[in-house]
């Protein structure tokens, strides 16, 4: 159980013990879970449709993964045959877990960059690495000192056009239930005029793997 009302959030084991190593499995790919991270385990199961969307389009593409966290989108892109991937996130531990995910899925030799940088201070660096055929933006809704969705997401959108290759596609994600359903669509339409937009819902599908059997929701 996670006590998210506490600061910092506390995870309480009600019965048994947490496995030292556990993996989520989705569409034949494996993603490392870290129960010591606090309230985020390193993998967001609700973004399965986004990863499937990216994987279907990734063959031969140059992919930019903004706010990459543990690089689950990167793994999906590589599984789809991406030419190269650039992951950028402030958290070095998250990127290290992302590299572990890449290696665990057999992509150790893939063309992947891991940039432990602030996105807002890295636009020139990202541009120097080339233009991108697919860009994923899945920022935190609120991260103290670095990102507030209402203030900062529009700034990200305004920068994307200079990074896009011809016929590029974007996957723009938002987890901010306090905002209107059309907020992101409206922001994108204003800053990326002329682009077609569509959306999809997020069903949940997750299998937990570990060295020992684990009851995700044991009887109490």
Set out the residue ranges of the language-model regions:
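Conserved class I S-adenosyl-L-methionine
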Residues: 60-69
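Non-catalytic substrate-recognition/targeting regions of SAM-dependent transferases
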Residues: 1-44, 52
